[in-house]
Structures are given as structure tokens and as C-alpha cells.
Amino acid sequence: MLNRYPLWKNLMVIFIVAIGILYSLPNIYGEDPAVQISGTRGQEANTSVLGQVQDVLKTNNLPTKSIVLENGSILARFTNTDDQLLAKDKIAERLGNNYTTALNLAPATPAWLSMFGANPMKWGLDLRGGVRFLMEVDMNATLVKRQEQLQDSLRGELRKEKIQYTAIKNTEHFGTLITLANVSQRAKAERIIRQLHPTLDITEPDADSINLGLSTAALNEARDLAIEQNLTILRKRVAELGVAEAVIQRQGAERIVIELPGVQDTARAKEILGATATLEFRIVNQNVTADAISRNMLPADSEVKYDRQGHPVALFKRAVLGGEHIINSSSGLDQHSSTPQVSVTLDSEGGEIMSQTTKKYYKKPMATLYVEYKDNGKKDENGKTILEKHEEVINVATIQGRFGSNFQITGVDSIAEAHNLSTLLKSGALIAPIQIVEERTIGPSLGAQNVEQGINASLWGLVAVIAFMLFYYKMFGVIASFALVINIVLLVGLMSILPGATLSMPGIAGIVLTLGMSVDANVLIFERIKEEIRNGRSIQQAINEGYNGAFTSIFDANLTTILTAIILYAVGTGPIQGFAITLSLGVAISMFTAITGTRALVNALYGGKQLKKLLI
């Protein structure tokens, strides 16, 4: 029979609409300003900490909507941001460095909805407010470090093969020049280097020298590796800040964008994300005298660094290990001297290296070198800020026994410095130093204004479209308008379910555009029905031919739009991608509501009936 859906298809439409309504409902309830308290150094918040937090809030007359202890962390909800900010400061002051106190926005979704995993969709920076950092990776520092590591490896490899050389020094474009003591060994040296370092370009400027340069492939590989590893570390640092729904992505060849929606403590975020500090552990060269240091008569494998009092310390250039082997750290006080210290835990490889080193250099001094990159106020020819490397010996201790993965570092100035250093080491040392080249803060009030304007635009667009459809298509306009509302509900529900989908102002523009495109499909169908009626077909045949005949045109038009959205997503960033996501999802949903959804309603109202007139 014409214009009748089988039962399974009607049930499918009802099920999809019901699921869409269910997962879009959390967006009605919004979010509460909240303070989240979680433990550091492997600790978890417990009932004792909960009692302290409740006492702080009661003492300062700060009312809460709720306060719960769950999964080792405490979440306190407030009615306004003023109470939230004051509570955060008071709680942090009471609990100290043993716990992380972070500002957050907690969904106010009822428990019965949370049982289904329903949560509100994520809002972008322009809607929620927050901070956006554009960070640039200093590739020069990365390539200099790679150059130093290469030269250190070459010295060991040439000595192992008994190839004598007089000098290994830097050349332009991060190259290395090896001057051989014996010209007859050049062929052997080149063969060894090609075997061990196949990505290097080898040239022969003179009979007794070999010039090594980084190939284009090696440069690109170094750049990509530095960016990807920095992205991983920055994600860990954002986790330390306790920020949910952060956006961290690469932009271009050497830049990283970080968006922290809802973050109000921007100074702390900037301090943690932009910090470049790390540690190196080096053996002190006791054979270098003070006189040799003053005359700069140092062995090729050693260099001088200074402690905080300005005293020189001769260190071997080769680090025992660096911050990349540190998997955990915590700050505290030394039990004997009550001075600040940082406890460090190494990975298995780092633990083995440290164990062998402390065995080899038993009763000899080892230094802890603090390394940080700072803005020196100058810019290069491309206008980029020049970062200057600052190194400082913060501790020299005699190795008193063999140890491995766990040890303590002293020599830091204060508890605060120890805590910051611990946080950075725990999240990982940046492979390449970075600098914040742009910082943009959007206040909650501006975000709220954007939300209001976006909602108003969507509502006015919806009202205008519905008014036109009701006026022009009568009862079929009612059906199309109902499908239009369901379209928005399904889109909101899908955006709430999809991980990584974030609603922004361009996304709202995509929704408004989707409204028009959804109605456009119905206009094609309805006009085709009217045309079939004018051609003398019965009403049931006209409805059937109207939907079947218009399908190809609707599918082709929407397919090209989806392909365009995919291209926008692939080549665009941030706002452009947000627009592309909502547009592509909206178009796909509009095909369902405009074709299958309205057909189900039309079939229910008119299917199988003898009709003499159709209100269209």
C-alpha cells in the first residue's frame, strides 16, 4: 500500500528521536561554578580533607549547592563565581601544596540523566570564556641540542673504532666538522658514520676533514618529533591544572594552540604551560683545578657552570640523564635539615642508568643542573623572540651509595619553587623550549553575551522559517516545522555525545545554516508533490512520487555540502573546524528529518486514506 511505513521503520524513527531528546536534555540544566580538590604526590582526598574543606567554607560563610567526595577528589559547587573564587583561595591556603585546588565548571545534570552517560555539549572559548595561548616552539634550541648529542656520540664512536681526530666543532646550519689526525682513516670514518647515522649528509671540504649536515628529511623529522612530544607534555600539564575540555593542537609547522575554556586563574596556567625548566644530572670533573678554570684551560669533554652564589663548577658535558627519564616527582621538606627538597622517581631505563653511574662514581660528586629558557627581550630577523638558555648548579652532592629509580634533590630556594619544579618534572620536560607569542582572554560576561546573541540568532531564524512554512504550505508546513525542531534536538544531542565536538560561535552559524538547508529539502519535496497533483495524479501517488522524485536532488545537494565541510575541517583550524563539524552533522541529520522523519508523519496522517484535497 502506498505511503505506509512498516512497523520497524516507524519504531526506528521513534527510537532515534527519543535518544536525541534524552541526550540533548542535559543542556537545559547548564553548569555550576565549582572548585575541585585533588591530591598530589599520589595522594587522594579523603573524609579528613573533606572535613577541612567544609570547615573552611563554614568559617568564611561560603554557601555551597553541594560538596561531594568521589574517586579520591572533592567537588564543591557554588551558586556564583564570586563565592567560587574566594573559596578556591581559602581552600588552597588551608590545604597547602599537598593538594591541587582548581577552578572548574561542573555540569548540573540530574542523576537520572547521568545514569545514561548524558552530559551537556562542550562549549568553546568564545561561548564559555577562558584563555587561549598561541605558543611557538624554538626549533633552534632543539637542533642545537641534537647537534650536541650527535657530537658526543661521534666522539665515542670514533674512539671505539680507533679513529683519531684533532677536533669536532660546530658549523653553520647545525652542521658538524670533524678534523682527522690521519687522512688515511677518512674512508673508514665515513663508512662508520654512514652506518650509524644514515640521515646525515656527508661532504669533504678538505682532505683531512668531514663535514656533516642534517638532511631536509632529518630536519623535518626533528621538527615533527619536537612538536608531537611537546603536545604530549602540554596535555599532561593541562591535566595538572585540572582543566576539562581543553583544546591542544598543532598549528602550522612550529606552533601550538591551547584553549582552556572556563579557566579564570590565567596567571597560574601561563606559569605552568610556558615554563621550560628541567634538570640534568652531571658528574663533577675533579681533575679541573680552580687555576685551569680561571684560565679557561678545560678538557674538551668538560665545561664550567655556576651555582647560585656565582662559584664555578667544572662538569662533564655529557649528562648522566635528563628530565625525559623522570616519571614522577613530589616536593616536601628534608627530614633532617627541614629544607625544601624534590623527590624524584625515574623510569626503568633511567633507574638502570643511575644505578650504574652511582656504582661507577662512588664517593665522587654529582651535580644537579637546573636548565631554563628565558626571553632576553631581543628578536631575530624574522621578528621571533630569542630565548636565552640559563643554567645553574643547584646542588652538588657526593655519591654515598648505589641508588636507582628513587632519590631526593636539595638546593632549591623555597617550598613554592620545589612545588613548581616538582609539577614540571612530573608532567615532563619539554623537548624543545616554547614561548607564548599570543595570549587572548575572553571573560565569562563576553562569553555569556556571545551565547545570548547566538541563541537569539537561532531562534529568530527558526521563527522566520516556521512562519514562512506555515503560511505557504499549510498543514505540510506544520509537519516541516515539527521536523525542523526535531532536527535541532537531534543535532544538540549528537554534539553532546560525540567526544571532541565543541560548540562555538561559528558552530552556531553552522546550525542556523542547517535550518535553512533542512527546510530547502522539504520545499523540494512539497513542490514536487504539488507538481504531481497538477499533472493529474491521485493524492497518494503524488505524495509517493514527491518523496521518491525529490530524493536524488536532495541527496546530491547535501552530499556536495558535506564534502565541502570535510575539506573545511581538513584544511581549517579552530573556529573553521567547529563550523565544519556542525554543518556536516546538521546536513546529515536534516536528510533524516526532512526525508524519513516528515515521510513518517505524512504517512501517519494521510497514508491509506481516500483524500480529495491536500492542504499544501
Curated annotation (Swiss-Prot):
Localization per Swiss-Prot or TrEMBL: Cell inner membrane
Transmembrane segments: 11-31, 453-473, 475-495, 497-517, 547-569, 585-605
GO CC entries: plasma membrane
Alphabetic keyword roster: Cell inner membrane, Cell membrane, Membrane, Protein transport, Translocation, Transmembrane, Transmembrane helix, Transport
Matching Gene3D superfamilies: 3.30.1360.200, 3.30.70.3400, Multidrug efflux transporter AcrB transmembrane domain
Pfam family, one: SecDF_P1_head
GO MF term set: protein-transporting ATPase activity
Topology relative to the membrane: Multi-pass membrane protein
GO biological process, one term: protein targeting
Function of the protein: Part of the Sec protein translocase complex. Interacts with the SecYEG preprotein conducting channel. SecDF uses the proton motive force (PMF) to complete protein translocation after the ATP-dependent function of SecA.
Assembly, per entry: Forms a complex with SecF. Part of the essential Sec protein translocation apparatus which comprises SecA, SecYEG and auxiliary proteins SecDF-YajC and YidC.
Record-stated family: Belongs to the SecD/SecF family. SecD subfamily.
Protein name per UniProt: Protein translocase subunit SecD
